[in-house]
């Protein structure tokens, strides 16, 4: 199945784009997606520190991703 990935902040710089279509297996969870992204983009090795939102709602690692979902990869925010 196919999902849309949106990258924000440093994630955009690491991947080299701010959005892309991405294929995942049916019944994949957020943790499955993280493993796949690390495998395909070694620059995202610290993705476990990032927040993940699916269809504009923050998601836990065990959430099953549905076909056509919009998944945002949001790095930690720092500053003051």
Residue ranges and their predicted role:
Residues 1-78:
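Ubiquitin-like/PB1-type beta-grasp interaction modules and other compact soluble beta-rich domains
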């Amino acid at each position: 199945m196919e999902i849309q990935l949106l990258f924000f902040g440093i994630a955009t710089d690491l991947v080299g784009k701010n959005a892309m279509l991405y294929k995942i297996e049916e019944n994949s969870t957020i943790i499955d997606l993280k493993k796949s992204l690390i495998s395909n983009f070694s620059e995202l090795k610290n993705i476990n520190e990032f927040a993940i939102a699916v269809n504009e709602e923050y998601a836990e690692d065990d959430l099953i991703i549905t076909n056509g979902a919009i998944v945002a990869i949001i790095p930690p925010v720092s500053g003051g």
